[in-house]
Swiss-Prot record:
Function field: Involved in pre-mRNA splicing.
Transmembrane segment boundaries: none
Native organism taxonomy: Eukaryota, Fungi, Dikarya, Ascomycota, Saccharomycotina
Chief subcellular location: nucleus
A Pfam family reported for this protein in Swiss-Prot or TrEMBL: SYF2
Subunit: Associated with the spliceosome.
InterPro entries the UniProt entry points to: mRNA_splic_SYF2
Gene name linked to the record: SYF2
Organism the protein comes from: Kluyveromyces lactis (strain ATCC 8585 / CBS 2359 / DSM 70799 / NBRC 1267 / NRRL Y-1140 / WM37)
Coiled-coil residue spans: 34-63
Protein name (database record): Pre-mRNA-splicing factor SYF2
Spans annotated as Disordered: 72-98
One BP term from GO: RNA splicing
The organism's place on the tree of life at top rank: Eukaryota
Length: 221
């Protein structure tokens, strides 16, 4: 009978050492798999937190928009019927907060992109609004302070004040609007006439036509 003997230094032929190596490899594989599972769990938690953050941001922005819309509504009292005024007031009511929160992330991203693109336009519109406000104040200050005619009107059951319009003031407002429209038309007409004016010395309709002809001449030279 041949008896296999393994020397302590013969690591390549030792079955005990091979078994130990297999166990070590299995342990390392298990540790690696466990780490991968941990990383996947962390990634899932991060995605969930990002989604919750976007949803909370959506709810906050929609609530802010609803509050700003509610505060910016102006109530105008006129000679309109009560039914029309009530319909107008119903339109000015803020939307349901629950309805505002039920927006998808895609809609929120579109709204965010649209808001960023319109920031420059808002700043420009702010300047126009300031000019319009100053013009309106100037026109109001120019109105005659005539109180010789008694005001006609009354108070409705809802507490609204109704005042009849003064025919003279209405006529003056119409004349002012017509005069302003006429001035705008004349300014626009002068600009168009200047653009379409024919320069007899050069033989060009306008600067754009002159540049186009110069470009053609340079191409054929």
């Amino acid at each position: 009978m041949n008896i296999l003997r393994y020397l302590p230094g013969d690591r390549k032929c030792s079955p005990y050492l091979n078994a130990t190596n297999h166990i070590v490899n299995w342990t390392q594989a298990d540790n690696k798999y466990s780490k991968m599972n941990d990383l996947m769990e962390i990634e899932k938690k991060l995605k969930s937190l990002r989604k919750q953050k976007v949803e909370v941001s959506i709810r906050n922005k929609k609530a802010i928009i609803a509050e700003e819309k509610k505060n910016s509504e102006r109530r105008v009292y006129s000679m309109a019927d009560d039914g029309e005024d009530k319909a107008r007031s119903n339109k000015s009511e803020p939307e349901d907060p629950i309805k505002l929160a039920n927006y998808s992330i895609r809609e929120y991203e579109k709204w965010e992109a649209k808001t960023q693109n319109s920031r420059h336009n808002k700043s420009v519109m702010g300047d126009f609004q300031t000019i319009a406000k100053n013009s309106y104040k100037k026109e109001v200050d120019a109105l005659p302070k005539d109180i010789s005619h008694p005001l006609k009107g009354g108070i409705t059951e809802d507490g609204k004040v109704q005042v009849e319009d003064n025919p003279e003031l209405v006529e003056k407002m119409v004349n002012d609007l017509n005069e302003r429209s006429k001035k705008r038309y004349m300014v626009r007409k002068q600009k168009l006439d200047k653009q379409n004016k024919i320069n007899l010395d050069d033989g060009f309709i306008n600067d754009k036509n002159k540049r186009f002809n110069a470009k053609l001449n340079s191409e054929f030279k």
